[in-house]
């Protein structure tokens, strides 16, 4: 067995496992939005608009998530992938 065969034999995910992983991500995202307050979608959009005043970004570069703990504590998590500055 050559060294090239070792690297070629790495397992590629089959379509079923890839589809399962994607479905799990979608379900987790929908569950997170289910407990969100009514104002959350509008607030999310307004936050994105404010960021766009300063940086050119697309919707897929922004992730906004609201996590609610059992202790009546809500955490708003905002992840923005900023473009490289030149």
From Swiss-Prot:
A Pfam family? MinE
- Gene3D superfamilies from the UniProt entry: Cell division topological specificity factor MinE (3.30.1070.10)
Domain of life according to the entry: Bacteria
Q: Which InterPro entries match?
A: MinE, MinE_sf
Q: Which SUPFAM superfamilies is this protein grouped with?
A: Cell division protein MinE topological specificity domain
What is the purpose of this protein?
Prevents the cell division inhibition by proteins MinC and MinD at internal division sites while permitting inhibition at polar sites. This ensures cell division at the proper site by restricting the formation of a division septum at the midpoint of the long axis of the cell.
Q: Which organism is it from?
A: Shewanella frigidimarina (strain NCIMB 400)
Q: What is this protein called?
A: Cell division topological specificity factor
What biological-process GO terms show up in the record? cell division; regulation of division septum assembly
Q: Which family does it belong to?
A: Belongs to the MinE family.
Assigned keywords, A-Z: Cell cycle, Cell division
